[in-house]
Design a protein with these regions (language model features):
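Long, aromatic- and glycine/proline-rich binding clefts that accommodate carbohydrate-like moieties
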Residues: 50, 338-343, 394-427
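Hinge/lid segment of periplasmic solute-binding proteins
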Residues: 43-58, 129-198, 337-344, 424
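Extracytoplasmic "Venus flytrap"/periplasmic binding protein-like
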Residues: 86-172, 206, 210-217, 302-306, ...
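Extracytoplasmic/periplasmic substrate-recognition and gating elements
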Residues: 89, 95-97, 117, 187, ...
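Short, well-ordered beta-strand elements
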Residues: 46-52, 62-73, 94-99, 123, ...
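Short, low-complexity disordered leader/linker segments with a strong preference
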Residues: 1-65, 89
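Glycine-centered hinge/linker elements that transmit conformational signals in sensory
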Residues: 226-228, 265-295
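Short, solvent-exposed loop/beta-turn-alpha elements that line the ligand-binding surface or hinge
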Residues: 54, 58, 144-172, 257-276, ...
Length: 427
C-alpha cells in the first residue's frame, strides 16, 4: 500500500501532459516588450529583461524591503520564517515582510485593487489567471533576462552566485511546472513554480476490498463501479468531485477538445465534444452516481469521510488535501482505510491530470524600484531552487516539491515511505 501511494504521487507529478491550474489561459493584454541592451539615463549599458532592465551589477547591496503576499497558514509560515533567516545570512539588507492574505482569490483581488493605486506587493503567490489579470496593467515582471543573467553577485558570507539560473538549476525544475510560467501567448516567462499538487482519486479501500471492486482507471470503468456501489448501498452517492471547473478543464484536455486560446478566438469550449461529456455526467447525477462541491454545498470530502447513512466511497480532490479525506478515529481506530489512485482517464495509456498549487510572480510599477525587483528575484530564486526548503515545505504542506532533486532527496524519500491509508495519508 505504501509503495502504491508513493508511486501514484510521483507519477502524477511527473506526467508530461500537465494542464494549467484553475481557470483558462488568458492572453497577456500588454504588448510584447523589446529585448536586448539599452542605455540607461546615465549612458550605461543595462541588460533588458522584457519590460524590466537589470541594473548593471545586479543587486548593489542596498537596504530594500520586499513585501510577499501568500496564503500560508501558521505551520507553513514557521517553515518560511526559518528560511528567511537563512536567506538573510546571505543578503542581510533584503528585508522580507511576508503576509498571509486569505485564500488565492483574496490574494488576486487585493493585488488587483492595489495595482490601481501603485501599492502592490513585490512578490505574490499566483495562478495563471492572476498573472493575466495583473498584466492588463503590465504589472508583472518578465523573468527571462533575470533567468539568463550572468552578472556575479557577492553575498554577505563572501561567496558569489550568478544573478540568473545555472543550467543545472533550470534542468532541476520539473519541466511541466517550469513551463507553466510561459503560457501567456508571448513566449515570455512570468512565474517560477513554488509548490504543486494535482487531483487524485481517493477511495474507501476497505469497502472496495470487502466487495471485490476494482479501482477504475477510465471514466467508463468509473461508471460501472458507481452502478455496482448503488446496488450494494442504494443510499450512497458513489462519487464526490470537489472542483467542477477542474473537472471540465481536465476533460477537455483528456479528450483533446478546444477550451481556450491565447490567440485568435479565445473562447473555444462551446463545442460538441465538451457538450457530450457534460451531458454524460449530468446523466450520472440524475442516477445518483455523483455530486460536486457546488451541488453538495461543501467540499465532498465531508461526504467521503461520513459515517452517516448517506456517504460516498470515492472522492476526487487535491493531493494536498489528503488529511481532509481521512475519517476521524472511533475508539482509537480509523473506520476505514483510504486508498489513493490517479483520476480516471479517457485513455488510460495517455493519462492527463491538472496541475495546481502556487507559483511566484514579481510585481513592478508604482513605487517599486529596480533594486526591489532584483532583490525580489533573489528571494524567489532562493525559495524555488533551494532543495532543503523545497523538501521541508512540501513535507509540511502536502504539496509536491517542484525540483527533481528534492523528490529524490533522502529525508523526503523517507517521509514518503511512511505513507499509508491511515495516519500518514498526507505523505
Amino acid at each position: 500500500m505504501k509503495r502504491r501511494i508513493v508511486a501514484v504521487l510521483l507519477l502524477v507529478a511527473m506526467m508530461l501532459s500537465m494542464l494549467a491550474a484553475c481557470g483558462g489561459q488568458t492572453p497577456n493584454q500588454g504588448e510584447t516588450p523589446n529585448q536586448g541592451e539599452t542605455p540607461n539615463q546615465g549612458g550605461e549599458t543595462v541588460q533588458t529583461v522584457g519590460n524590466f532592465a537589470v541594473p548593471e551589477g545586479g543587486y548593489d547591496g542596498s537596504e530594500v524591503t520586499i513585501r510577499f503576499y501568500n496564503t500560508m497558514g501558521a505551520n507553513l509560515r514557521e517553515v518560511l520564517d526559518l528560511y528567511i533567516v537563512e536567506f538573510n545570512k546571505l543578503y542581510p539588507n533584503i528585508h522580507i515582510e511576508a503576509s498571509q492574505v486569505g485564500n488565492y482569490d483574496d490574494v488576486r483581488e487585493q493585488i488587483a485593487t492595489e495595482i490601481t493605486v501603485g501599492n502592490q506587493p513585490n512578490i505574490a503567490y499566483c495562478y495563471p489567471d492572476h498573472v493575466a489579470l495583473y498584466n492588463i496593467a503590465k504589472a508583472v515582471t518578465t523573468l527571462d533576462g533575470l533567468i539568463e543573467s550572468d552578472i556575479e553577485v557577492t553575498r554577505a558570507d563572501g561567496t558569489t552566485e550568478i544573478l540568473g539560473l545555472t543550467d543545472e538549476q533550470k534542468a532541476d525544475f520539473i519541466e511541466g511546472y517550469y513551463n507553466e510560467g510561459k503560457q501567456f501567448g508571448d513566449g515570455l516567462m512570468y512565474t517560477l513554480p513554488m509548490s504543486k499538487s494535482t487531483e487524485v482519486l481517493y477511495y474507501n479501500k476497505t469497502f472496495f476490498d470487502e466487495n471485490g471492486l476494482t479501482v477504475p482507471t477510465t471514466w467508463d470503468e468509473l461508471e460501472a463501479v458507481c452502478a455496482k456501489i448503488k446496488e450494494i448501498d442504494p443510499n450512497a452517492i458513489p462519487l464526490g468531485y470537489d472542483s467542477e471547473a477542474n473537472w471540465f478543464i481536465t476533460m477537455t484536455e483528456q479528450y483533446g477538445a478546444p477550451y481556450t486560446s491565447a490567440t485568435g478566438d479565445h473562447f473555444l469550449f462551446n463545442n460538441d465534444t465538451n457538450k457530450e461529456f457534460v451531458k454524460r455526467f449530468r446523466e450520472w447525477y440524475k442516477k445518483g452516481y455523483l455530486t460536486t462541491q457546488e451541488i453538495y454545498g461543501s467540499y465532498t470530502s465531508g461526504l467521503f469521510v461520513s459515517t452517516e447513512e448517506v456517504k460516498s466511497y470515492m472522492s476526487i480532490g487535491s493531493s494536498a488535501g489528503a488529511t481532509h479525506q481521512r475519517p476521524k478515529m472511533v475508539d482509537g481506530v480509523y473506520p476505514f482505510e483510504v486508498g489513493i489512485a490517479t483520476i480516471p482517464q479517457v485513455d488510460a495509456s495517455n493519462p492527463k491530470v491538472i496541475s495546481q498549487g502556487p507559483s511566484l510572480c514579481i510585481l513592478q510599477g508604482g513605487k517599486t524600484s529596480d533594486q526591489q525587483v532584483v532583490a525580489s528575484w533573489l528571494f524567489v530564486k532562493y525559495l524555488t531552487t533551494n532543495m532543503a526548503f523545497q523538501t521541508e515545505f512540501s513535507s509540511t504542506s502536502g504539496y509536491m516539491p517542484v525540483l527533481e532533486s528534492a523528490q529524490q532527496e533522502e529525508n523526503y524519500a523517507a517521509w514518503l515511505a511512511k505513507a499509508d491509508g491511515y495516519s500518514f495519508l498526507t505523505a
